[in-house]
Amino acid sequence: SYVKPNILEANTNYVVTDPKQEVLTATGGWLKQNGYEIRVLNLVNLEQSDGYNPFRYLRDEKDALKLVNNLIQATTPKGSHESDPFWTKAETALLQAIILMLFQEAPEYEQNFSMVMRVLEYAEVKEEDEEYISPLDLLFQAIEQDRPDSVAVRQYKVFKMAAGKTSKSILVSTAVRLAPFNLPQIKAITDHDDMDLYTLGEKKCALYAVIPDNDTSFNFLVSLLYAQAFQALYYSADQIHHGA
């Protein structure tokens, strides 16, 4: 393989997809001896992973919307063809509302996917009572009073256009999509951040995404990580180094 020899030259920064942890084992120690910071998203041995919290890389509303779109794409099985895109669009609106709300309203320690899952629990729907107001409805009503132009509120209203039974199906579908974030090991990874993606182009570092070769259950995290890593590099080049 040409990957390991290239890395062992230690002449640039690296972002490496590493099935079964073989590349990290062969090159990580060498890079560390040569002054590199090593960051690892480890989906083979979850307990050994560094933290990765996608919320840490949201600078504005556009970033939040990108995160949701990337999450939806990364958690949709490849080759699947929807007969009705309504459900995915409805899930997207709900997730945009919740993630924007946390990004704009919540303290930093609550900006993570564990809190997204908790917020989903507040979105109760009673099929027999279309007038029922859930705890999450009350929260968004309070936000609307303070900030009538809130994009989070607008997206929540899109979700609320659905009737009771349909809303319940949207909630279930969203919760199933995000089910991995209920696992303690994934929660431990995504509740904090060690990746420091904005420094990828600033100092010697290597980022390894260690993935199993026989299970893709959590690979969506790698997709999110790569998308945000490249966004961070573009931001650093354009805004900090002014395109240099």
Give a label for each model feature:
Residues 1-244:
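P-loop NTPase motor domains
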